[in-house]
Amino acid sequence: MISFIVCLLLLITGYLTYGKIVDKTFGPDDRETPAVRINDGVDYVVMPQWKLFLVQLLNIAGLGPIFGALQGALWGPVVFLWITFGTIFAGGVHDYFSGMISERNDGASIAEVTGKYLGHTMQNIMRVFSVVLLIMVGTVFAVGPAGLIVTLCKSNGVSGVLSTTLFWLILILVYYFIATFISIDKIIGKVYPLFGMCLIIMAVGVIIGIFTNPNYTIPEIWSHLYNMHPSGTPVWSFMFITVACGAISGFHSTQSPLMARCMKNEKQGHFVFYGAMVAEGIIALIWAAAGCALYEVTGGLNTGLAEALAGGQSAAIYDVCSKTMGGVGIALAMIGVVICPITSGDTAFRSARLTLSDWFHMDQSSYANRLKLCIPVLGIGAILGIGNATGLIDYTVIWRYFSWTNQTLAMIVLWAAAMYLFTEKKNFWMAAVPATFMSAVSCTYFILAPECLGSLLNSKTADGTVIYNTAVAYPIGIVFAALLLALFIRATKKRSAKKSA
């Protein structure tokens, strides 16, 4: 329990200290923000700081810090270290700069921001990359909740059309269309802060339930400095990829521009962007602690948690909430597993619309222009979702690559932030160091993961246990990261030479 408390205090201290250093390095001032200067009444709308924070938290979180943290807890309390230091030095930096650099560029989507600092080729790659990722996220966060609602309906004796996935999927997609089309302050700005509060209350309830129950003990890091994963999956770099949103996530960079278009003052950035990431880190830390404390450890391995997760991640959330909060927890769990994914899904589609509008320079104050983008974006989502629900399409093959693409996106955004800082003659190492680290993480995972190159390089024992080829993957990951750092330094020298010429 001491480990947990220390990590919690470090996260809070990190926000108050390193977060301030990051903010000071960027240098927010009193210039007019895009929300004030452009104010189109659709995407550029001034919202109060507390709403910006809660909407940003819900947009970047959803169930990410819960699912990822519970999965990360399979490796044991060592996951506390990554959540804590990853949030402070990587995730917070990533989210802050993706939001604030966007704000300095009229609220531009992350693809446009990246292109400005990493070149036109990277811009086009990021445009396609972002739109595909966002539509996939939106679709998955429509199909998932629809299936959960059907399960709840059937368990309560509901039959007929209300017990079909197709009905609820269409209903969710219709809502997504409305939320993607209308002004950001009509639904997202009014309702989402309430759900953001629910996410926080659920986490607080879980940790209070653990602290007040003598049967639950959060293990200490120093007593479990070994791999507790039942399958023996390597800590590096699987844990770093699995935790995702609880420490750093590239998806956040697609969401930050939404709030960058709604800030009244640049000085709100520290609380809205860095603060929301720290809040998500705290939520992830709590759920990781729950995963470590509530389930049986057999032979030094987290077998109990593995069994709980085998029943489905939503079932695991339900189990944790019921054990720690009883009936209230069950109600919160139901809200969480249904509402939170939906709130990430609609903003994913909205971000896809904005990415395309920036790409093709389409004014979004026009109803016609918004329809021109909403219809194809939601249309593709509907085809994928309904096709999957009816068994005609299986997009899970593409979705398997989400973990890798998500953190690769984070890596690219950090390199863009580093180049921005260099261009502005500021401490670029603040972003370059985590960018280098995430480059090693992303490359190593790509080599080891079964859905990537792992199926070719790894081997199996007679009982089916995977033997990961770390002897090849680890050196390649390190060399790849060092190479990108060298290329970055070379690019900075070229820019300096051009300026002095």
Language-model-derived ranges and their functions:
Residues 47-64, 207-215, 224-287, 332-344:
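Hydrophobic, membrane-embedded alpha-helices of multi-pass small-molecule transporters
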